[in-house]
Amino acid sequence: YFYAIEYIVNRFLDKTKYERHNKYLQELYIPNPPTDIQQQIVTEIEQVVNAAALLTQQIKQKENEIENLLSSIQYGDDSLKTIAPFATKSIKYFEIESETYITTDNMLQNKLGIVPFEGEANISSITEYKKDDILISNIRPYLKKIWFADKDGGCSKDVLVLRSADTNKYLPKYIFYMLRRDVFFDYVMEGKKGIKMPRGNKEDILKYRIPIPSIDEQMRIVSQIEALESEITKARNLIENTASEKQTILDKYL
């Protein structure tokens, strides 16, 4: 009955109230189709669940391929202070489109980018960012919030903006991939300030070193990773559709 209960919860319960309380559950009607229909529901939904599990494994495999590629790079290194120092130009909030505003709140955990900002920010001064900049949340670095800017905009002061010092020598996307690694966030956490709300130490962050191959090699590496990223994105999109696929099956039989 798990899938039937899931169907009821998702379709009929008011999510604004705590309706999983016993008094509501006692009044719930749970469909009880014939056994053969129940078995068909289970079979079809398990196919969806198993497909999602396989996609999750594929994502992990592709992520490991990316990490193995990046960890195998053996070239002379340099510090972020030289490669991609902080961009710190302050601008006014009214100078940007509100949907381009980035805060720690609309940055997603585990390196998943951002979601659009909604509403109006109660703030005047923000930090300008440009397309191809790298934005990193400096609050609770262990949440691993990082984004490669695909547009111009502004961000809160709790978001660090790193910009390639010379795009002819340091490819922005290459820098981004080198910083989007667990090893970088582990490094930031080692030098953190504060306990309850830890922040990265900006001076230490600028000391972080990454290997710098030729610009042609950087482009080749980025191209390889982007191909893997494309496969990961496709798999994630399919996983996101899992809930609606399960609901379609339940709607068909219940």
Q: What is each of the regions a protein language model found here?
A:
Residues 136-137:
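A generic structural signal for residues embedded in beta-strands
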Residues 143-149:
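Short, Lys/Arg- and Gly-enriched loop/turn segments at beta-strand edges
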